[in-house]
Amino acid sequence: MHIDYLCDHPELIEELATLNFKEWGEFRPGQTVEHRIEHMRESCGKGAVPSVVVALEGSRLLGGALLIESDLKLRPNLTPWLAGVYVKAEERGRGIASQLVDRVVAEAAALGVPELYLYTDTSQSLYARLGWEVVEELVYEELPVTVMKYVILR
């Protein structure tokens, strides 16, 4: 298994975007899978914000994660964000999500980013184990979520 930039594997954009849409599309009313594909395509930077990394086994997609400018409309002052951390169900339990998160943190650190943010409704313990701190609990799009941050530069 290795992690690479999605922009170096454009044939996987549609697959990753579709997986993201199936996982979180219900929380974005009015968004279509086509919109998610376009957003994924636009986010395909390399060594920049935005960028997308993917976990691969050979050429097979296992999961992905994004580094984006903003992910929570309620907190526009917080930037940048780790978003869309997703691992295919059959590949979970192998530490892939942790490796994707670590890679995005490393990307942000290389860019001189002092802090990175995320929000989650279910994976607080995963991120806490990786060193993320709770910022606040709130309701976003009718869903209780936890906003967390990772301090890169102390």
Predicted features along the sequence, with ranges:
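A short beta-loop-alpha structural element at the N-terminal edge
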Residues: 2-16
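Hydrophobic alpha-helical core bundles mediating ligand binding, dimerization, or RNAP-core interactions
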Residues: 16-24
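Active-site rim helix/loop that mediates acceptor-substrate recognition in acyltransferases
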Residues: 26-56, 62
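Conserved beta-strand in the GNAT
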Residues: 52-54, 60-70, 81, 86
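Conserved acetyl-CoA-binding loop-helix of GNAT-fold acetyltransferases
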Residues: 84-87, 93-106
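Conserved GNAT acetyl-CoA-binding A-motif
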Residues: 108-121
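C-terminal "cap" of GNAT-fold acetyltransferases
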Residues: 118-123, 136-154
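Conserved acetyl-CoA-binding loop of GNAT-fold acetyltransferases
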Residues: 128-138
